[in-house]
């Protein structure tokens, strides 16, 4: 099956583990989820046929949960429990680890200087963002008022873009989240945690941008 003309966001939601494949190739399927596979591959100078072949293998497996057809209230409850609660645990721990690594290894050229600052910025942005969703937007959608939520949704999408930009800064700051040979246990654990955060946040944004928001605006 030809996947090249399909949007990345749609592929990430319809094919098991496609999101992990896109992460491997550093392709943005959340904020950039509307771009086609062909366009995304061209921008990264990747062979689209190779990626299509990998997607075809993944597509042979059953998908665990197809959120594209789930009730909006169920999607919202899932987002709060699976992503919002998780981010509230992840970021404070990562900030503590980054503070320690930057202090203890300050003399090493490979230390990710400024990482604590960037993680703190992300934490502050996401905390405010998630609170607005939980207190304003999500109740509107649950009450069947999603079609009137163009304003709040456009603000949330803009904040998603800002979070995505911060993730790019963090990836650049950490050599694409790759620990150097001299990294201590805390350093390695922190990078594992950052990779997990990036995976979770991209899946979180993808589910909102590519499923929840369009369906809410359509009046479901």
Curated annotation (Swiss-Prot):
Originating species: Escherichia coli O157:H7
GO biological process, one term: response to nitrosative stress
Keywords: Cytoplasm, Iron, Metal-binding, Stress response
Self-association and partners: Homodimer.
Gene name of the encoded protein: ytfE
Localization of this protein: Cytoplasm
GO MF, one example: metal ion binding
Stated family: Belongs to the RIC family. YtfE subfamily.
Cited InterPro entries: FeS-repair_YftE, Hemerythrin-like, RIC_family
Name this protein carries in UniProt: Iron-sulfur cluster repair protein YtfE
GO cellular component, one term: cytoplasm
Reported function: Di-iron-containing protein involved in the repair of iron-sulfur clusters damaged by oxidative and nitrosative stress conditions.
Presence of keyword Mitochondrion: no
Pfam families per record: Hemerythrin (PF01814), ScdA_N (PF04405)
Broad class of the protein's primary localization: cytoplasm
